[in-house]
Amino acid sequence: MTNIRKSHPLIKIINHSFIDLPAPSNISAWWNFGSLLGVCLILQILTGLFLAMHYTSDTMTAFSSVTHICRDVNYGWIIRYMHANGASMFFICLYMHVGRGMYYGSYTFSETWNIGILLLFTVMATAFMGYVLPWGQMSFWGATVITNLLSAIPYIGTNLVEWIWGGFSVDKATLTRFFAFHFILPFIISALAAVHLLFLHETGSNNPSGITSDSDKIPFHPYYTIKDILGILALTLTLMLLVLFSPDLLGDPDNYIPANPLSTPPHIKPEWYFLFAYAILRSIPNKLGGVLALVLSILILAIIPLLHTSKQRGMTFRPLSQCLFWLLVADLLTLTWIGGQPVEHPFITIGQLASILYFLTPLVLMPISGIIENRLLKW
């Protein structure tokens, strides 16, 4: 068996990636989120496949087909809610994974980091299109508002929006193409994830100390496989508690009302995992400025490696940078809360201040703290 594992052309790749892979001996539970994201992706593809067998991407029947899945299909309700809440778990793991990369300086692996940013954008696009498919009020108006933002692009904006819509408003053509893209994108994400791993295994994993661990490696199996299984069990428990006890906790009640172009909901808002970006978009009174800020709120991750001024890699031994990192986390939570609130005083002001702080912390304060810490250590 050992010979096949090490000599078979296909099994050999799996062996070098998940069994005999040399891994640092000191990586913490924060390194579990990569495998959890893989599990989430597989879960989403499988549940999505079964949903696609019963879903119809037509404006007249989309809402009814989702109701039919929940009421008439065997265990359709659990498949639907695992898919909806699985997306929330996916984003929790995704944000934790990105946060860990920022905290421990994993962004110095530039290829892995950049592929990761591309993955983040792709997952966000997939989730947005998936939210449109049930064709409830929030699906329809969310699609209308977010796609309409592209009209802020000079010269080509209006034509671009109508091209994406497939007409003069969000309608049957829009729903059909969103379903097609929502179906194909997870497979593209899988391919990108494989490239992400390929680049990671070129350099090897980072570790909490931030220094090279070449002198102290251990095999991935059994040490980290068992550790990953514990993480998967925790993820499964959390997901099933959510699905079985409060499946609609993270959803919007308005999405149980069929889409009606003649009636606008009082508060249009996306799913909770996009609220921070939505709050940044709303905090800028100018449409084009808001769209640019929205894109930059994610693209800022690509700038972070260029602004790394510290001579240490991670923040493990940098208390000043740690304070700023947790300030950024608190700011993100504030933005998430603001994104779900109506556009009125005092939420507008809080949102604007939180948006300024969101860009100020990684672009200005963190590089300065890196320089100060170098000076304090006489480097």
UniProtKB/Swiss-Prot annotation:
GO biological process: mitochondrial electron transport, ubiquinol to cytochrome c
Protein name per Swiss-Prot or TrEMBL: Cytochrome b
One protein family per Pfam: Cytochrom_B_C
Binding site residues for heme b b566: H97, H196
UniProt miscellaneous comment: Heme 1 (or BL or b562) is low-potential and absorbs at about 562 nm, and heme 2 (or BH or b566) is high-potential and absorbs at about 566 nm.
Ligand binding (a ubiquinone): H201
UniProtKB keywords: Electron transport, Heme, Iron, Membrane, Metal-binding, Mitochondrion, Mitochondrion inner membrane, Respiratory chain, Transmembrane, Transmembrane helix, Transport, Ubiquinone
Membrane-crossing segments per the record: 33-53, 77-98, 113-133, 178-198, 226-246, 288-308, 320-340, 347-367
GO MF assignments: metal ion binding; ubiquinol-cytochrome-c reductase activity
Domain of life: Eukaryota
Family that this chain belongs to: Belongs to the cytochrome b family.
Cofactor annotation remark: Binds 2 heme b groups non-covalently.
Cross-referenced PANTHER family: CYTOCHROME B (PTHR19271:SF16)
Annotated binding of heme b b562, by residue: H83, H182
Cofactor list: heme b
Localization: Mitochondrion inner membrane
Subunit: The cytochrome bc1 complex contains 11 subunits: 3 respiratory subunits (MT-CYB, CYC1 and UQCRFS1), 2 core proteins (UQCRC1 and UQCRC2) and 6 low-molecular weight proteins (UQCRH/QCR6, UQCRB/QCR7, UQCRQ/QCR8, UQCR10/QCR9, UQCR11/QCR10 and a cleavage product of UQCRFS1). This cytochrome bc1 complex then forms a dimer.
Protein function: Component of the ubiquinol-cytochrome c reductase complex (complex III or cytochrome b-c1 complex) that is part of the mitochondrial respiratory chain. The b-c1 complex mediates electron transfer from ubiquinol to cytochrome c. Contributes to the generation of a proton gradient across the mitochondrial membrane that is then used for ATP synthesis.
Keyword Transcription in annotation: no
GO CC aspect terms: mitochondrial inner membrane; respiratory chain complex III
Cross-referenced InterPro entries: Cyt_b/b6_C, Cyt_b/b6_C_sf, Cyt_b/b6_N, Cytb/b6-like_sf, Cytochrome_b, Cytochrome_b_C_euk/bac, Cytochrome_b_N_euk/bac, Di-haem_cyt_TM
Coarse class of the protein's main subcellular location: mitochondrion
Name of the gene this protein is made from: MT-CYB
Bilayer topology: Multi-pass membrane protein
